[in-house]
UniProtKB/Swiss-Prot annotation:
It comes from the Bacteria. Belongs to the universal ribosomal protein uL10 family. SUPFAM superfamilies: Ribosomal protein L10-like. Forms part of the ribosomal stalk, playing a central role in the interaction of the ribosome with GTP-bound translation factors. This is Large ribosomal subunit protein uL10. PANTHER family: 39S RIBOSOMAL PROTEIN L10, MITOCHONDRIAL. One of its GO terms (molecular function) is large ribosomal subunit rRNA binding.
Length: 161
């Protein structure tokens, strides 16, 4: 009996360290998902540098406590945690895309760069475009007025000729 307790303690410590070193993580309830969907999610997450882990609630609770994260409270039901070490938003986006197809998924919350986000805020952040998309939107907003001025100057110069 002592070996299993030691194993669970080591596992929760290892998960806690991975949570601390990640840029973001999300916890969600996966009740109703089949194995093929979870496997596809794992593959998609691997491409983004993220990892999915299904844990017993007690082990997940201990890992969160060791990481000094108390906002999730009691975890009930079958829960999974996804964390990312490369991109902050990628794990949230992948789970968000999965919730579009499967209404049985319930997001419990997430942590992004040390800030707790509830389910609603997590969904709104995950629905935003990625960083490159936001940069292109900003660039088009900045170049739009300049382009208008250039077209007006070109039209004025053509009318004078």
């Amino acid at each position: 009996m002592k070996k299993i307790i030691q194993f669970k303690d080591n596992l929760s410590s290892e998960i806690s360290e991975q949570i601390k070193s990640s840029k973001s993580f999300i916890i969600f309830e996966y009740l109703g998902l089949d194995a093929a969907t979870i496997t596809k999610l794992r593959k998609d997450l691997f491409k983004t540098g993220s990892k999915l882990l299904v844990l017993k609630n007690n082990i997940l609770r201990r890992a969160l406590e060791k990481a000094n994260i108390k906002e999730f409270g009691d975890l009930v039901g079958p829960n999974a945690i996804v964390w990312g070490t490369e991109d902050e938003i990628a794990p949230l986006k992948e789970v968000f895309n999965l919730t579009k197809d499967n209404e049985c998924i319930k997001i419990k919350g997430s942590y992004v760069e040390g800030t707790f986000l509830d389910a609603q805020k997590t969904m709104s952040i995950a629905s935003l475009p990625n960083r490159e998309g936001l940069y292109s939107m900003l660039l088009s907003c900045l170049t739009g007025p300049i382009r208008g001025v250039l077209y007006a100057l070109k039209a004025v110069s053509e009318t004078k000729n």
